C-alpha cells in the first residue's frame, strides 16, 4: 500500500501467478486504489460481495465453497475482512500480513489460517502472527466449538515464504461454509454492516464496537446484545423448526414465544440483499427489548 500504481500493478501480476489451484476458480483482484490501506477501505466489502455474486450466478460457484486469502498487503486485508465478512466464506488464510486494529471476534464460525515467515520482522508481522493465534486459542477455550484456526510459522524464511503457504489451498478446499450456525458472534469494526448470518439490524443503527452474541438451541434463540434495542431474526428450518413455536430471549427477557410463519417475501428480501440462495431466510421476525411495564 502507498506505492505508485505501476508497483501495485506489478505485484498484482505476481499474485495472479502465485497459486494454481486444481480445486476450483482462482481470482486475484487488484485493489481499486493505491492508498496505504488498499484492502481496508469501505468499498472493498461491496467489491467482494459483487465478485462473489457474479461467480455464483455466472460461473456456477457453490456459495458454500468460497474462500478468502491474501499475501502481504492482501494479508492485511484478510485480517480485516474475514471477521466482518465471515458469513460469506468457508475459510480464510492470511499470509505475511499485519492486522492493524482488526478484531478476531467475528471469526467464531470461520476457519482461519495464519502463515508467516519466522524472520518476517518488519512491523512485527512474525510476532503478531503468533499473538493473533494465541488470541484465537483463548477465544476457542472460552467458546468450545468456535474459532477453528491454524498457525504456520516457517523457520528461516522472511516475508517471502517460497510458496510454502500454498498448503492453505487444499486445506481450505476441504472446508464448507455453514450459513446457519447455531451460535454467532457479530462484532462491528471497520466498515459497518446490518446483516450477519441469521441476524439483521435496522438500517443505520450499527455502531462501531457493538457486539452481539446469539445462540439457537431447541427452538429457543438467546440474544446477548447490550445497546441493541431491536433487531431482526432471519430464520430457516436449518436453524429452528418453524413448524413449532419459537422462543426468543433478548438481553435476559423473553420478547417472543409463538409460531413464525414462512414467508415468500422473506426469501425475496434476502436475495435482493445478497444473491446467496443458501443463506436466504424463509421467515423474518422483528424483536425488540421490553421496556417499563411491558
Where are these regions (language model features)?
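Primarily recognizes the serine-hydrolase "nucleophile elbow" in alpha/beta-hydrolase
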Residues: 3, 7-8, 64-108
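Alpha/beta-hydrolase-fold serine-hydrolase catalytic core, especially in secreted/extracellular enzymes
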Residues: 137-294
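Stable alpha-helical elements in mature extracytoplasmic
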Residues: 8, 44-51, 74-81, 85-88, ...
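Active-site machinery of serine-nucleophile hydrolases
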Residues: 1-57
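Sec-exported extracytoplasmic/periplasmic mature domains
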Residues: 21, 53-60, 83-87, 137-142, ...
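The feature captures the conserved acid-bearing segment of alpha/beta-hydrolase catalytic domains
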Residues: 90-173
Amino acid at each position: 500500500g502507498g506505492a505508485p500504481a505501476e508497483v501495485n500493478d506489478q505485484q498484482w501480476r505476481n499474485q495472479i501467478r502465485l497459486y494454481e489451484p486444481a480445486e476450483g476458480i482462482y481470482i486475484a483482484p487488484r485493489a481499486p486504489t493505491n492508498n496505504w490501506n488498499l484492502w481496508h477501505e469501505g468499498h472493498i466489502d461491496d467489491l467482494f460481495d459483487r465478485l462473489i455474486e457474479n461467480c455464483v450466478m455466472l460461473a456456477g460457484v457453490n456459495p458454500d465453497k468460497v474462500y478468502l486469502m491474501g499475501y502481504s498487503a492482501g494479508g492485511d486485508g484478510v485480517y480485516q475482512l474475514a471477521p466482518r465478512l465471515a458469513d460469506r466464506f468457508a475459510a480464510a488464510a492470511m499470509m505475511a500480513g499485519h492486522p492493524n486494529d482488526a478484531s478476531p471476534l467475528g471469526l467464531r464460525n470461520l476457519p482461519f489460517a495464519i502463515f508467516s515467515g519466522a524472520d518476517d520482522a518488519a512491523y512485527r508481522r512474525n510476532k503478531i502472527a503468533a499473538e493473533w493465534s494465541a488470541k484465537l486459542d483463548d477465544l476457542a477455550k472460552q467458546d468450545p466449538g468456535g474459532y477453528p484456526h491454524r498457525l504456520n510459522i516457517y523457520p528461516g524464511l522472511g516475508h517471502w515464504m517460497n510458496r510454502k503457504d500454498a498448503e492453505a489451498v487444499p486445506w481450505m478446499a476441504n472446508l464448507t461454509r455453514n450459513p446457519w450456525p447455531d451460535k454467532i458472534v457479530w462484532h462491528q469494526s471497520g466498515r459497518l454492516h446490518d446483516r450477519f448470518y441469521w441476524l439483521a439490524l435496522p438500517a443505520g443503527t450499527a455502531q462501531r464496537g457493538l457486539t452481539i452474541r446469539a445462540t439457537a438451541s431447541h427452538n429457543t434463540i438467546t440474544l446477548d446484545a447490550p445497546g441493541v434495542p431491536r433487531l431482526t431474526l432471519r430464520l430457516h428450518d436449518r436453524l429452528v423448526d418453524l413448524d413449532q413455536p419459537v422462543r426468543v430471549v433478548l438481553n435476559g427477557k423473553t420478547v417472543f414465544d409463538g409460531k413464525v410463519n414462512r414467508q415468500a417475501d422473506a426469501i425475496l428480501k434476502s436475495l435482493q440483499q445478497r444473491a446467496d440462495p443458501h443463506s436466504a431466510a424463509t421467515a423474518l421476525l422483528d424483536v425488540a427489548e421490553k421496556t417499563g411495564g411491558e
